[in-house]
Protein backbone atom coordinates (compact mmCIF):
# COMPACT_ATOMS: atom_id res chain seq x y z
CA UNK A 1 0.00 0.00 0.00
CA UNK A 2 1.22 3.48 -0.86
CA UNK A 3 2.25 5.62 2.08
CA UNK A 4 -0.36 8.19 3.10
CA UNK A 5 1.43 11.53 2.99
CA UNK A 6 0.44 14.88 4.44
CA UNK A 7 0.13 16.31 0.94
CA UNK A 8 -2.37 13.58 -0.01
CA UNK A 9 -4.46 14.34 3.06
CA UNK A 10 -4.31 18.06 2.28
CA UNK A 11 -5.37 17.42 -1.33
CA UNK A 12 -8.36 15.33 -0.26
CA UNK A 13 -9.34 17.90 2.36
CA UNK A 14 -9.16 20.60 -0.32
CA UNK A 15 -11.54 18.61 -2.53
CA UNK A 16 -14.05 17.68 0.17
CA UNK A 17 -13.48 20.09 3.07
CA UNK A 18 -13.88 17.08 5.38
CA UNK A 19 -12.04 17.00 8.74
CA UNK A 20 -8.33 16.12 8.47
CA UNK A 21 -8.56 12.81 10.37
CA UNK A 22 -11.51 11.66 8.27
CA UNK A 23 -9.50 12.36 5.12
CA UNK A 24 -6.60 10.31 6.49
CA UNK A 25 -8.88 7.39 7.43
CA UNK A 26 -10.53 7.45 4.00
CA UNK A 27 -7.16 7.40 2.22
CA UNK A 28 -5.99 4.54 4.42
CA UNK A 29 -9.16 2.55 3.73
CA UNK A 30 -8.82 3.28 0.00
CA UNK A 31 -5.12 2.27 0.09
CA UNK A 32 -4.07 5.66 -1.21
CA UNK A 33 -6.55 5.77 -4.11
CA UNK A 34 -7.67 9.42 -4.17
CA UNK A 35 -10.83 8.81 -6.21
CA UNK A 36 -11.96 5.93 -4.00
CA UNK A 37 -11.15 7.94 -0.86
CA UNK A 38 -13.28 10.80 -2.13
CA UNK A 39 -16.16 8.38 -2.76
CA UNK A 40 -15.79 6.98 0.76
CA UNK A 41 -15.98 10.48 2.20
CA UNK A 42 -19.09 11.24 0.15
CA UNK A 43 -20.72 8.23 1.82
CA UNK A 44 -19.57 9.35 5.27
CA UNK A 45 -20.74 12.90 4.66
CA UNK A 46 -24.09 11.51 3.62
CA UNK A 47 -24.36 9.54 6.86
CA UNK A 48 -23.58 12.71 8.76
CA UNK A 49 -26.47 14.36 6.96
CA UNK A 50 -28.77 11.59 8.16
CA UNK A 51 -27.65 12.01 11.77
CA UNK A 52 -28.14 15.78 11.59
CA UNK A 53 -31.59 15.63 10.03
CA UNK A 54 -33.41 15.46 13.34
CA UNK A 55 -31.80 18.54 14.84
CA UNK A 56 -33.75 21.79 15.14
CA UNK A 57 -33.06 24.45 12.50
CA UNK A 58 -34.24 27.73 14.00
CA UNK A 59 -31.57 29.99 12.52
CA UNK A 60 -31.14 30.74 8.84
CA UNK A 61 -31.53 33.33 6.12
CA UNK A 62 -34.23 34.93 4.02
CA UNK A 63 -33.23 35.54 0.42
CA UNK A 64 -35.03 36.93 -2.62
CA UNK A 65 -34.65 37.03 -6.39
CA UNK A 66 -36.31 39.49 -8.76
CA UNK A 67 -36.24 39.48 -12.57
CA UNK A 68 -38.69 41.80 -14.36
CA UNK A 69 -42.17 40.91 -13.04
CA UNK A 70 -41.17 37.47 -11.70
CA UNK A 71 -39.64 36.94 -8.28
CA UNK A 72 -39.27 34.61 -5.32
CA UNK A 73 -38.80 34.72 -1.57
CA UNK A 74 -37.21 31.82 0.33
CA UNK A 75 -36.37 30.85 3.91
CA UNK A 76 -33.48 28.44 4.43
CA UNK A 77 -32.86 27.25 7.99
CA UNK A 78 -29.80 25.95 9.82
CA UNK A 79 -28.91 25.26 13.45
CA UNK A 80 -26.62 28.16 14.40
CA UNK A 81 -26.09 31.78 13.44
CA UNK A 82 -22.47 30.94 12.58
CA UNK A 83 -23.50 28.91 9.53
CA UNK A 84 -25.61 31.79 8.17
CA UNK A 85 -22.31 33.48 7.28
CA UNK A 86 -20.85 30.41 5.55
CA UNK A 87 -20.19 31.05 1.85
CA UNK A 88 -21.38 27.60 0.76
CA UNK A 89 -24.62 27.91 2.74
CA UNK A 90 -25.30 31.37 1.30
CA UNK A 91 -24.51 30.18 -2.22
CA UNK A 92 -27.05 27.35 -1.79
CA UNK A 93 -29.73 29.76 -0.55
CA UNK A 94 -29.16 32.26 -3.36
CA UNK A 95 -29.12 29.55 -6.01
CA UNK A 96 -32.30 27.97 -4.66
CA UNK A 97 -34.33 31.18 -4.71
CA UNK A 98 -33.24 31.80 -8.31
CA UNK A 99 -34.30 28.27 -9.24
CA UNK A 100 -37.72 28.95 -7.70
CA UNK A 101 -38.22 32.08 -9.79
CA UNK A 102 -37.06 30.43 -13.00
CA UNK A 103 -38.63 26.96 -12.66
CA UNK A 104 -41.84 27.48 -10.64
CA UNK A 105 -41.63 24.31 -8.50
CA UNK A 106 -44.97 23.20 -7.06
CA UNK A 107 -43.66 22.56 -3.55
CA UNK A 108 -40.52 21.90 -1.48
CA UNK A 109 -40.19 18.37 -2.86
CA UNK A 110 -40.24 19.67 -6.43
CA UNK A 111 -37.70 22.34 -5.49
CA UNK A 112 -35.37 19.73 -3.99
CA UNK A 113 -35.49 17.69 -7.21
CA UNK A 114 -34.33 20.54 -9.47
CA UNK A 115 -30.93 20.09 -11.18
CA UNK A 116 -28.10 21.87 -9.37
CA UNK A 117 -24.44 21.25 -8.55
CA UNK A 118 -22.19 23.02 -6.04
CA UNK A 119 -18.99 22.25 -4.13
CA UNK A 120 -18.69 18.89 -5.86
CA UNK A 121 -22.21 17.80 -4.86
CA UNK A 122 -25.19 17.13 -7.13
CA UNK A 123 -26.92 16.50 -9.46
CA UNK A 124 -29.97 17.90 -7.62
CA UNK A 125 -30.52 20.66 -5.09
CA UNK A 126 -31.34 18.00 -2.48
CA UNK A 127 -28.02 16.25 -3.13
CA UNK A 128 -26.20 19.53 -2.60
CA UNK A 129 -28.12 20.20 0.60
CA UNK A 130 -27.24 16.78 2.01
CA UNK A 131 -23.63 17.15 0.91
CA UNK A 132 -23.30 20.51 2.64
CA UNK A 133 -24.81 19.09 5.83
CA UNK A 134 -21.93 16.64 5.93
CA UNK A 135 -19.35 19.21 4.89
CA UNK A 136 -20.43 21.90 7.36
CA UNK A 137 -21.66 19.57 10.10
CA UNK A 138 -25.06 21.17 10.66
CA UNK A 139 -28.57 20.34 9.61
CA UNK A 140 -30.08 22.74 7.09
CA UNK A 141 -33.45 22.79 5.37
CA UNK A 142 -35.59 24.70 2.90
CA UNK A 143 -38.53 25.77 5.02
CA UNK A 144 -40.88 27.78 2.80
CA UNK A 145 -40.96 29.81 -0.40
CA UNK A 146 -43.29 31.90 -2.49
CA UNK A 147 -43.05 32.69 -6.19
CA UNK A 148 -44.47 35.92 -7.60
CA UNK A 149 -45.74 36.07 -11.19
CA UNK A 150 -49.13 37.79 -11.05
CA UNK A 151 -48.17 40.45 -13.58
CA UNK A 152 -47.93 43.14 -10.91
CA UNK A 153 -44.73 45.09 -10.36
CA UNK A 154 -42.50 43.80 -7.57
CA UNK A 155 -40.52 45.58 -4.87
CA UNK A 156 -38.37 43.70 -2.37
CA UNK A 157 -36.51 44.54 0.80
CA UNK A 158 -34.14 42.42 2.89
CA UNK A 159 -33.28 43.57 6.39
CA UNK A 160 -29.93 41.87 6.72
CA UNK A 161 -30.60 38.19 6.13
CA UNK A 162 -33.29 37.70 8.78
CA UNK A 163 -36.31 39.57 7.37
CA UNK A 164 -37.54 39.61 3.79
CA UNK A 165 -40.47 41.40 2.18
CA UNK A 166 -41.94 41.39 -1.32
CA UNK A 167 -44.60 43.93 -2.29
CA UNK A 168 -46.82 43.51 -5.36
CA UNK A 169 -47.88 46.91 -6.65
CA UNK A 170 -48.79 49.30 -9.44
CA UNK A 171 -47.44 52.83 -9.52
CA UNK A 172 -44.32 54.41 -8.05
CA UNK A 173 -41.36 52.05 -7.45
CA UNK A 174 -39.81 54.25 -4.76
CA UNK A 175 -43.07 54.34 -2.80
CA UNK A 176 -43.38 50.56 -3.09
CA UNK A 177 -39.81 50.09 -1.83
CA UNK A 178 -40.66 52.33 1.13
CA UNK A 179 -43.70 50.16 1.84
CA UNK A 180 -41.51 47.05 1.80
CA UNK A 181 -39.19 48.68 4.36
CA UNK A 182 -42.23 49.70 6.41
CA UNK A 183 -43.58 46.14 6.43
CA UNK A 184 -40.21 44.83 7.65
CA UNK A 185 -40.22 47.35 10.50
CA UNK A 186 -43.90 47.33 11.55
CA UNK A 187 -44.90 43.78 10.58
CA UNK A 188 -48.58 44.25 9.64
CA UNK A 189 -50.64 41.08 9.30
CA UNK A 190 -52.95 42.27 6.50
CA UNK A 191 -53.49 45.04 3.96
CA UNK A 192 -56.65 46.43 5.57
CA UNK A 193 -58.74 45.89 8.69
CA UNK A 194 -61.18 43.79 6.67
CA UNK A 195 -58.37 41.41 5.70
CA UNK A 196 -57.18 40.60 9.24
CA UNK A 197 -57.78 36.86 9.84
CA UNK A 198 -60.95 36.13 11.82
CA UNK A 199 -59.10 34.06 14.41
CA UNK A 200 -56.87 37.02 15.28
CA UNK A 201 -59.89 39.30 15.65
CA UNK A 202 -61.62 36.72 17.87
CA UNK A 203 -58.53 36.38 20.04
CA UNK A 204 -58.26 40.14 20.47
CA UNK A 205 -61.97 40.40 21.34
CA UNK A 206 -61.50 37.65 23.93
CA UNK A 207 -58.56 39.50 25.49
CA UNK A 208 -60.53 42.75 25.63
CA UNK A 209 -63.50 40.97 27.24
CA UNK A 210 -61.27 39.31 29.84
CA UNK A 211 -59.73 42.69 30.69
CA UNK A 212 -63.20 44.23 31.10
CA UNK A 213 -64.24 41.37 33.39
CA UNK A 214 -61.11 41.81 35.48
CA UNK A 215 -61.77 45.55 35.82
CA UNK A 216 -65.33 44.81 36.94
CA UNK A 217 -64.07 42.34 39.53
CA UNK A 218 -61.59 44.88 40.92
CA UNK A 219 -64.29 47.58 41.05
CA UNK A 220 -66.69 45.26 42.89
CA UNK A 221 -64.04 44.29 45.44
CA UNK A 222 -63.28 47.96 46.07
CA UNK A 223 -66.95 48.82 46.48
CA UNK A 224 -66.94 51.00 43.37
CA UNK A 225 -69.68 51.12 40.70
CA UNK A 226 -69.36 48.65 37.84
CA UNK A 227 -69.68 49.88 34.26
CA UNK A 228 -72.90 49.03 32.44
CA UNK A 229 -73.00 46.23 29.89
CA UNK A 230 -73.41 48.81 27.14
CA UNK A 231 -70.25 50.69 28.14
CA UNK A 232 -68.32 47.43 28.51
CA UNK A 233 -69.41 46.37 25.01
CA UNK A 234 -68.22 49.70 23.60
CA UNK A 235 -64.88 49.32 25.40
CA UNK A 236 -64.39 45.85 23.97
CA UNK A 237 -65.26 46.97 20.44
CA UNK A 238 -63.01 50.01 20.82
CA UNK A 239 -60.12 47.75 21.80
CA UNK A 240 -60.72 45.53 18.79
CA UNK A 241 -60.83 48.49 16.40
CA UNK A 242 -57.59 49.86 17.87
CA UNK A 243 -55.94 46.49 17.31
CA UNK A 244 -57.16 46.32 13.71
CA UNK A 245 -55.64 49.72 12.95
CA UNK A 246 -52.34 48.69 14.52
CA UNK A 247 -51.96 45.51 12.46
CA UNK A 248 -53.37 46.54 9.06
CA UNK A 249 -50.87 48.06 6.65
CA UNK A 250 -53.05 50.82 5.22
CA UNK A 251 -54.05 52.12 8.67
CA UNK A 252 -50.55 52.12 10.17
CA UNK A 253 -48.63 55.37 10.57
CA UNK A 254 -46.02 55.45 7.80
CA UNK A 255 -42.65 54.63 9.32
CA UNK A 256 -40.83 57.41 7.41
CA UNK A 257 -43.47 60.05 8.20
CA UNK A 258 -45.77 59.38 11.15
CA UNK A 259 -47.92 62.39 10.23
CA UNK A 260 -49.61 60.28 7.54
CA UNK A 261 -50.83 56.72 7.22
CA UNK A 262 -49.46 54.29 4.66
CA UNK A 263 -52.75 54.61 2.78
CA UNK A 264 -52.36 58.40 2.60
CA UNK A 265 -48.76 58.08 1.39
CA UNK A 266 -49.80 55.65 -1.34
CA UNK A 267 -52.62 57.91 -2.50
CA UNK A 268 -50.25 60.88 -2.66
CA UNK A 269 -47.82 58.92 -4.84
CA UNK A 270 -50.44 57.30 -7.08
CA UNK A 271 -49.44 53.83 -5.94
CA UNK A 272 -51.60 50.76 -5.31
CA UNK A 273 -50.33 47.91 -3.14
CA UNK A 274 -52.04 44.67 -4.14
CA UNK A 275 -50.34 42.33 -1.68
CA UNK A 276 -47.28 41.88 0.49
CA UNK A 277 -45.40 38.87 1.82
CA UNK A 278 -43.29 39.00 4.98
CA UNK A 279 -40.84 36.27 6.04
CA UNK A 280 -38.98 36.36 9.36
CA UNK A 281 -36.31 33.72 10.03
CA UNK A 282 -37.45 31.03 12.43
CA UNK A 283 -40.93 32.48 12.84
CA UNK A 284 -43.02 29.89 14.66
CA UNK A 285 -40.11 27.48 15.21
CA UNK A 286 -39.43 26.55 18.82
CA UNK A 287 -35.72 27.11 19.33
CA UNK A 288 -33.84 24.67 21.54
CA UNK A 289 -32.00 26.48 24.33
CA UNK A 290 -29.35 24.79 26.44
CA UNK A 291 -26.78 26.30 28.77
CA UNK A 292 -23.13 25.58 28.02
CA UNK A 293 -22.55 23.46 31.15
CA UNK A 294 -25.50 21.23 30.29
CA UNK A 295 -24.27 20.88 26.70
CA UNK A 296 -20.77 19.82 27.85
CA UNK A 297 -22.26 17.36 30.34
CA UNK A 298 -24.44 15.87 27.61
CA UNK A 299 -21.45 15.46 25.28
CA UNK A 300 -19.36 13.81 28.04
CA UNK A 301 -22.20 11.41 28.83
CA UNK A 302 -22.56 10.50 25.16
CA UNK A 303 -18.80 9.91 24.85
CA UNK A 304 -18.83 7.70 27.94
CA UNK A 305 -21.66 5.58 26.54
CA UNK A 306 -19.84 5.22 23.23
CA UNK A 307 -16.60 4.06 24.88
Curated annotation (Swiss-Prot):
Keywords assigned by UniProt, alphabetized: Cytoplasm, Elongation factor, Protein biosynthesis
Keyword Cell membrane appears in the UniProt entry: no
Gene3D superfamilies according to UniProt: 1.10.286.20, DNA helicase RuvA subunit, C-terminal domain, Elongation factor Ts, dimerisation domain
GO cellular component: cytoplasm
UniProt cross-references to InterPro entries, sorted A to Z: EF-Ts_dimer_sf (IPR036402), Transl_elong_EFTs/EF1B (IPR001816), Transl_elong_EFTs/EF1B_dimer (IPR014039), Transl_elong_Ts_CS (IPR018101), UBA-like_sf (IPR009060)
Major subcellular site: cytoplasm
Record GO terms (molecular function): translation elongation factor activity
Pfam families (UniProt xref): EF_TS
Subcellular location: Cytoplasm
Region (Involved in Mg(2+) ion dislocation from EF-Tu): 80-83
Keyword Iron among UniProt keywords: no
Family designation: Belongs to the EF-Ts family.
Protein role: Associates with the EF-Tu.GDP complex and induces the exchange of GDP to GTP. It remains bound to the aminoacyl-tRNA.EF-Tu.GTP complex up to the GTP hydrolysis stage on the ribosome.
Name the record gives this protein: Elongation factor Ts
Record lineage: Bacteria, Pseudomonadati, Pseudomonadota, Betaproteobacteria, Burkholderiales
